Amino acid sequence: NLSLRTMVITSATTLKDICEEFRNSTADLILIDENSVIAEPHLNVLTDYPRTASAALVAPQKNGNTFVRQYRVASASSESHKVSTGNRDFVGAMRLSQNQREPILNALTSASTRGAKGNALDLTLVALVRATVRVDAAEVWAAPYVRSSSEYERKLVKDQLAKINMNSVRLRMANRANDGFFSVFFLRKFSKILTWIAVRIGVTPNQITLISFAIGLYAAYQFALGDFWQILFGAILLQISIIVDCVDGELARYTRKFSKLGAWLDAVTDRVKE
């Protein structure tokens, strides 16, 4: 993403360095720990997804070093700060949003004067969270990762990633696993297949939205006819419309093609179908 800047965080990096790098740019800043090995689809969640706030890559972990509540980082750890009950691990990559420029600069400037010990990336996350700057939690799953000073551990994960089909990882990540029970275990099972077909034939997310809308309208027409079999056919069409409606978002996440028009079109057609 050409609108972003990237800064690799080493053991020598300080909070002041990060603050100055962010201050001297008008672009969002990606921070990556030199000891982190992260799959490209996971980094894409930070770099290519539309974001209005800062975000940090985290992975589910019982008693982890980070606490996430309602998809936002609520508490974080460093060498000088500990989380009492964590439910995620910070993977070692985050995005600082220029939409929060002043709060971020104030938080980092204030934190840098305290002289807390620890990795500058961890201290940055702690500083933002404690200053109540919004940091969205971007989940890492479907592929291994590591944040370790051990070269052996990093090489092990790199070798594992080299054997994985990243397109399959993108598809699994696009297929949301945090929806309701019926969506996860029924609708999304079928939508994933349709999404893969859409990728292969080159259909756009907006085209999928219109197809779902057309199926939904025809389902409504069948309901209006009032005959038992037509109502049954309409009910089947409505389920198909709902499944197809999952595909536009999955396709957008897979291809990383997001637009305000697409979001508006999806919202409007959903309301009409309802």
Locations of the language-model features?
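Acidic (Asp/Glu-rich) catalytic motifs at the cytosolic membrane interface
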Residues: 233-274
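Catalytic beta-strand/loop signature of glycosyltransferases that borders the donor
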Residues: 88, 136-142
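Conserved beta-strand scaffold positions in the cores of enzyme catalytic domains, especially
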Residues: 6-9, 54-56, 132-137
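Topogenic membrane-insertion module of multi-pass membrane proteins
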Residues: 140-233, 243
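A short acidic, often aromatic-flanked loop/helix-cap motif at beta-alpha or helix-coil junctions
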Residues: 12-17, 63-65, 143-145
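Conserved core of the sugar-phosphate nucleotidyltransferase
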Residues: 37-131
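Conserved N-terminal catalytic core of the sugar/cofactor nucleotidyltransferase
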Residues: 1-41
